Amino acid sequence: MNIHEYQAKELLRDYGVPVPRGQVIYDVRDAQRAAWHIESDIAVVKAQIHAGGRGKAGGVKIAKSITEVEQFSRELLGKTLVTHQTGQEGRVVKAILIEEGCEIYKEYYIAFTLDRENSKIALIASEEGGMDIEEVAANRPDKILKEIIDPLIGLTDFQGRRVCFNLNIDGSLINDTVELMKNLYRCFIEKDCSLLEINPLVITKNNRVMALDAKINFDGNGLYRNEDVLKLRDLNEEDEKEIEASKYNLSYISLDGNIGCMVNGAGLAMATMDIIKLYGGNPANFLDVGGGASEEKVMNAFKIILSDPKVKGIFVNIFGGIMKCDVIAKGIVNAANEVKLNVPLVVRLEGTNVELGKEILNQSNLNIVTATTMADGAKKIVKLIK
């Protein structure tokens, strides 16, 4: 689950992390009041959407007067902001964060994330903070520092100091910076984060350490024990199909392609998307119905796939273990009849009750193409939609 920048900063403030004073507004008529409230000669007007790259897309503006604060707020509110993370459709700006400006002496990048190679949390840092951090990571990986954190000990002072030394942070600010890192780590652990990113972390010209921007993602599996975090969820920023899928405990992620996929098991789902790409197609989604899905769950999964107007064909790839092939077949047939299937459908079934499942499909009178292998299915669906 993602949250907005202003929400992330409110959370970090509770953990003792220095952040700029700011006010969030939803109506341009509140812009002047917010500007007066932060009591700053320079204000930063920032579009609030669940995507990075706002600065390069014109979603962050520096205002030198209250008049400019109102002007920039009017320009941004209601605007569709397109960044490299939003896709071509972009995101509509429905909230603005107006916060105090500060004179920046130096920018850094600090983040906590899961290091899957080591199965531990990693502190990632760079002296090259700011809008171009992704280019730095791609072209100058030697500028990226990593500290692996022992979960039994947590982030230690010596690790924090080592990062500070490697970032060339002034000695007078090392204690403050280490304390900030430890507070970020505490938030990461206690709130079940999957990513906590500060970009940039800045040293101001009056020698303060401050988190100027913040991005936090949460592990959805931990939300049950963080109800305060769950309350921050903004459904307007989420894909409608993903919201619908979450109601039925389906793992669904929208993609940019035109071949809908329904698979059981995350590994098989990723392999299915890969093989579709291999044969020249583009998957429209990741969809894992799970190991013990009911007929109703399968039917709802099928409906969600078909609700995507980009979908020109569907590939169902099921290996029945706990999941029975006849249950999948019944769900597909019922959903196809209900929504009046009008796109090509390729089904590959293997495993428990496979013959019964195939019989159900054959007797359905639907235009279903069967496949013997995953590769066979991928080839057929790619050919059918061209």
Curated annotation (Swiss-Prot):
Keywords, sorted A to Z? ATP-binding, Ligase, Magnesium, Metal-binding, Nucleotide-binding, Tricarboxylic acid cycle
Question: Which SUPFAM superfamilies does the entry link to?
Answer: Glutathione synthetase ATP-binding domain-like, Succinyl-CoA synthetase domains
Family annotation (InterPro entries): ATP-grasp, ATP-grasp_succ-CoA_synth-type, ATP_grasp_subdomain_1, Succ-CoA_synthase_bsu_CS, SUCC_ACL_C, Succ_CoA_ligase-like_bsu, Succinyl-CoA_synth-like
- Name the cofactor(s): Mg(2+)
- UniProt enzyme class: ligase
Q: Which residues bind ATP?
A: K46, G53, R54, G55, E99, C102, E107
What is catalyzed by this enzyme? Answer: succinate + ATP + CoA = succinyl-CoA + ADP + phosphate; GTP + succinate + CoA = succinyl-CoA + GDP + phosphate
Any single Gene Ontology cellular-component annotation: succinate-CoA ligase complex
Relay the cofactor remark from the entry: Binds 1 Mg(2+) ion per subunit.
**Which lineage do the record's taxonomy fields give for this organism?**
Bacteria, Bacillati, Bacillota, Clostridia, Peptostreptococcales
| Ribosomal protein keyword on record | no
Subunit-level organization: Heterotetramer of two alpha and two beta subunits.
The answer on whether this UniProt entry bears the keyword Transport reads: no
Biological role: Succinyl-CoA synthetase functions in the citric acid cycle (TCA), coupling the hydrolysis of succinyl-CoA to the synthesis of either ATP or GTP and thus represents the only step of substrate-level phosphorylation in the TCA. The beta subunit provides nucleotide specificity of the enzyme and binds the substrate succinate, while the binding sites for coenzyme A and phosphate are found in the alpha subunit.
One GO biological process term is: succinyl-CoA metabolic process
Q: Where does substrate bind?
A: N264, G321, I322, M323
Which gene does this sequence derive from?
sucC
Full protein name? Succinate--CoA ligase [ADP-forming] subunit beta
Q: In which pathway does it act?
A: Carbohydrate metabolism; tricarboxylic acid cycle; succinate from succinyl-CoA (ligase route): step 1/1
Q: Which PANTHER family match?
A: SUCCINATE--COA LIGASE [GDP-FORMING] SUBUNIT BETA, MITOCHONDRIAL (PTHR11815:SF10), SUCCINYL-COA SYNTHETASE BETA CHAIN (PTHR11815)
What domain of life does the UniProt record list for this protein's source?
Bacteria
GO molecular function: any one? Answer: ATP binding
* Family note: Belongs to the succinate/malate CoA ligase beta subunit family.
Task: State the EC number(s).
Answer: 6.2.1.5
Q: Where does Mg(2+) bind?
A: N199, D213
- Start and end residues of each ATP-grasp domain: 9-244
